[in-house]
Amino acid sequence: EHSIVFAPAGTHRDVRNRTVLGGRGAQAEQVARMVSDGGKIRNSSTLVAETEAVRGFLECDGLMLKPQGRIESVPALDAQVDQAQLSHEASVGMIDDAKLDYLRAFGLGEDNARDLIVQGFLNLEDQRIPESVRATVENLVTAARGAEKM
């Protein structure tokens, strides 16, 4: 399961996911990508292993575009049996000024450079993300950046 959460200024997103691996040999991968453009995001993702020989992976990554925003990401693993393999990765950080400077050196404006970094972070080209979702996310990011200029 892949989720993308975008929070423009003045918004608060509270996302909770719980995946139960209840059948022998079950597998799950949850990937959450969060972008705060001044809004607040709280993400809580849990993998529960209830039976033997299950595997699960959580990935929760957040990108802050403005220091006024906030991202809180809480990954949780609940192995209720001995033979479960569960793991997670999580990161939250500000947009990298060095990356912005690098892209601006090639003639991109700051807004275009930010949009490019966000799109790369979200990995919208991932074939597991439906085309309709990709288009919606791109439109939301563009609209939020446009509203900011008004």
Q: Where do the PLM segments sit?
A:
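Conserved beta-strand/loop scaffold segments within soluble protein domains that form the structured core
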Residues: 1-108, 122-124, 128-150
